Amino acid sequence: MGYKSFCCLLLLLTGNVSLRAQGIDDISPMAIYNIGLVGCDSIGVNVLKTFISTGEARCVAVFDEKTTLAESAEREITSIQDKAPLLYNDYCKMLDRRDLDIVLIAVSKEEQDKFFLKACEYDKNIYIEISQCLSPEEI
C-alpha cells in the first residue's frame, strides 16, 4: 500500500469520510522549498548549504544589512544552485515575496528578535539559528 493510499484510508477510518482526501494531492514528495537567508556570515551560508544539499530547497532571496556580506553570499550560493538568489536591502520587501516558504535567520543574538517578529507578522515559516552559549556579561 502506497503512502497516498494509506493516508486516504486513514482519513476515511477516522471519520473524515470523503471520496477524495483533501490536501493529499497538494503535498508533493518532490516539493522544493524556497528559502530566504537573513544573515550572510559563514554560519548562515553553511546552514543554507545544508538545506540546499538535501535537494528539497533552494535559496531565492538574500538579505544582510552589510551589502558586501550579502553579495559574497550570493556568489557562493550561485555556485551550488542553478539560479542566483535576489539580493534585498529591505527586509520587508523580501518578506513580501509570495513564493518565499522559509525564512532562515542566522544573525547575532541581539538582532534575532526584530527579524523573528517581523517574519511572524508576515506569517512565514521560520528556521532560526540560536546560539547556545552565554557571553561573560550574561553569566
Please give the residue ranges for each predicted region.
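Bacterial N-terminal signal peptides that target proteins for export
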Residues: 1-7
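N-terminal Rossmann-like dinucleotide-binding module
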Residues: 10-13, 19-80
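Acidic-histidine catalytic/liganding microenvironments
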Residues: 54, 97-98
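Conserved acidic residues
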Residues: 60, 85, 99-101
